[in-house]
Each structure stands twice: as C-alpha cells, then as structure tokens.
Amino acid sequence: MLLLLAEYLQQFHKGFAVFQYLSLRGILGVLTALVLSLWMGPWLIRTLQLRQIGQAVRTDGPQSHLSKSGTPTMGGALILSAIGISTLLWADLANRYVWVVLAVTLLFGAIGWVDDYRKVIEKNSRGLPSRWKYFWQSVFGLGAAIFLYMTAQTPVETTLILPLLKNIEIPLGIGFVILTYFVIVGSSNAVNLTDGLDGLAIMPTVMVGGGLGIFCYLSGNVNFAEYLLIPYIPGSGELIVFCGALIGAGLGFLWFNTYPAQVFMGDVGALALGAALGTIAVIVRQEVVLFIMGGVFVMETLSVMIQVASFKLTGKRVFRMAPIHHHFELKGWPEPRVIVRFWIITVILVLVGLATLKLR
C-alpha cells in the first residue's frame, strides 16, 4: 500500500525510490508489527479478561499448569493483526506470493479461532472436533497447494530441492500438490502441539521465520540464487516483508507471553503461524530446510506419534506425557528451563539450516 504511494511520490522527489529496496521494507515490516503488537497488547489482554476468555487447562497434565487456568487466550489474534497490517502497508500487493501466504495464515487462523472459541464457551480443552479441524485444514491446505501448482511459471517451482546435494532436483509434477498439502497442514499442527508452555512456540517460530526470510530474499535475487545454487523464484523476495512482520509481531507478543504468561496465543495463533511457515518453505522450495530449522516442532510431533502408537500397540507409554515438553516437566525440569533449552536447540538448528546455503 505505502509502496504504491512511494512510487507515485517518486515523480516529485527521487528520494522515495528508497522504498523499492526489499531490505528496507523488511526492516520496516519488523518495526511496524513490533510497535503494533506492543501498542495493542495491553488493550487486547484487558478485553479478553473482561469477556472472561480464559484458557481451559487439562486436569491430567502437570499440576503446575493448574495455576494457568483462566489466563486470557486467543492472543494469536494480536499476532495476526500486526502481521496483516504491516504486510499490507509495506509489501508489493501485486505479488501473488504475498496474497497466498496472507490467505493461508488468516484462513488457518480462522480455524483456530473457532477452536479456541468453543473451548472458552464449553469450558474445556477439547474445542473443535478433530475431524472438522483436519477437514478445514485439508480444504485450505489443498486449495493453497493447487493454486501454487496451477500458477507455477517455471519448472523449478514444482521441483523438490535437496540441500547438501549439488544439482540434484526431483521434478514432482502433481506430487507437488501432495507434498505441499502435508507441509502446510503438518507445520500448522506441529506448531500447535509445541504451544504448551509460556513462550515455547512463539520464539522458535520467530527464529524459523527469520531463517526462511533469508531464503526468500536470496531466492528472489537471480545473482544470489545462481551463486548459492538455490532455486531462483521470481517474486519470492517480497516475502521478506511478511517474514519481517512475523518477527516483529512475534517478539511483541512474546513481551506478554513470556513466563509467567499474561496471555496465550491459542490455536488462532499457533495453527496460523505453522501454516505460514510451511507455505513460505514450499514457495522457496526449502521444505527440507524447514524440517531442519523447525526441529523442535518435528520433535514435539514425533513424540505424540510415538506415544500414541506405543500405547495402542503395547499398552505402554514411551514418555511420561506427550508432547515431549510435558515429559521434561514431569521429570522435574522447571518450565523456564524447558523453554530456554528448546530455544537454544532452535538457534542451533536454524544456523544449521542456513549453513546449507554454502554446504552444497
């Protein structure tokens, strides 16, 4: 929106051409979303408290979590609002990738909103029935996958890229739709499973979003892409604005979500942010790198899958409780220790993911 204004004002003063730089608009995206989050946060928390929109806590979980009952939830609406406003202000609105990622983020956020709302109304932690949650996730995930497949302009946009392996590209054809579906829906649910402790999900999301933002910037520049042997995806660089907005909104939300949390993001935030990360990774053809950088999300998801499979097959549990962050809590780790150690793991994994740029 403001980019269009800057382009118009260039005819009066050449200084407005500075807004053509992606790096500047990415930074402005961070700052705008951060300020919006910090500004709207207190108002949102007060509103949620007045309307008694509080978190319902599982009674079979760690006893320390019982004190969290009633903490305002659905704070993800703050994150999505800041991301949306900042992106619309600073991104090129003629870019199809910007609209795809925004649409996926808001649609998955809508699923989470309904889920959170039902939890609040029914005063339990079940929310929207799983079959309906997965149904709508599948509808929106497949919709995004089909759109990206149908609008692909070059073969590389539907090709599987394997990091660390030079010049190895696997054309996916219609398989691109299937892979994209699983990446988007899987990422959405993985972040949601991770969102069980104060600040546990949002900081890794910010870190992974920052890492993917770097890939977006590089993939959108033909010179960088050729030098680093990564796919050149015209227009993908514009997603650095969205990633910047995600970083700013996430950090602003963390101000209120850090231990002990004043507000939880709820499914409205977790489902949306996970889907956004998955969609961005698909666009820049870095699904494998997302798997690496989002290792904490993968670990949380696998712990649930292993726990369920083990109990159904043998009647025994592998972990004291799943997702795995609860396992460590029940082992006696204080909540802040679990959170910070998972953050440290994410820092390392994001650096490993970025290292694949040179290890080819």
Curated annotation (Swiss-Prot):
It is found in: Cell inner membrane. Signal peptide: none annotated. CDD domains: GT_MraY. One of its GO terms (biological process) is cell division. The chain crosses the membrane at residues 25-45, 74-94, 97-117, 132-152, 168-188, 199-219, 236-256, 263-283, 288-308, 338-358. Pathway: Cell wall biogenesis; peptidoglycan biosynthesis. Keywords: Cell cycle, Cell division, Cell inner membrane, Cell membrane, Cell shape, Cell wall biogenesis/degradation, Magnesium, Membrane, Metal-binding, Peptidoglycan synthesis, Transferase, Transmembrane, Transmembrane helix. It is a multi-pass membrane protein. Its EC number is 2.7.8.13. NCBIfam families: mraY (TIGR00445). Catalyzes the initial step of the lipid cycle reactions in the biosynthesis of the cell wall peptidoglycan: transfers peptidoglycan precursor phospho-MurNAc-pentapeptide from UDP-MurNAc-pentapeptide onto the lipid carrier undecaprenyl phosphate, yielding undecaprenyl-pyrophosphoryl-MurNAc-pentapeptide, known as lipid I. This is Phospho-N-acetylmuramoyl-pentapeptide-transferase. The gene is mraY.
